[in-house]
Regions:
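Thiamine diphosphate
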Residues: 1-124
Length: 124
């Protein structure tokens, strides 16, 4: 696929929705991997996909710093793969409270439309 989405946990359904929107709006092929767990990462599959993809996107319901996306970056760097990565997740700072997760995600760039815009910008 042109773009590979690697999602963890509660972000898997979000990744499928993002893949559908991204493919419809860009005409690119978009794949989704349910990573199931952060460690150990499936390095063989990640490296294989990254070598043929234009972009890798990780989606996690946790801090991106030191999280699943960082593990993906380290894995690719260790294999000499330079495919760009977009890490979608929570910022490395205190995240306030909200009445619902949709509001909280929107406040931190993680609404469906915001994630789509972030990925599309990375493809330019």
């Amino acid at each position: 696929a042109d773009v590979q989405l690697w999602a963890l946990g509660t972000m898997v359904p979000e990744a499928h929705a993002l893949a559908d929107k991204l493919a419809a709006e860009t005409g690119l092929s978009v794949g989704v991997v349910n990573a199931r767990f952060a460690k150990p990462i499936d390095a063989t599959l990640l490296v294989e996909q990254a070598r043929s993809a234009k972009l890798i996107v990780t989606l996690e319901d946790g801090a991106v710093t030191g999280g699943f996306g960082t593990g993906a970056l380290e894995t690719l760097a260790g294999h000499g793969v330079r495919t760009p990565i977009v890490r979608l997740g929570w910022p490395d700072r205190f995240v306030g409270h909200a009445t619902d997760v949709k509001t909280l995600r929107a406040a931190h760039g993680l609404s469906p439309d915001q994630m789509l815009a972030t990925v599309k910008a990375a493809l330019k």
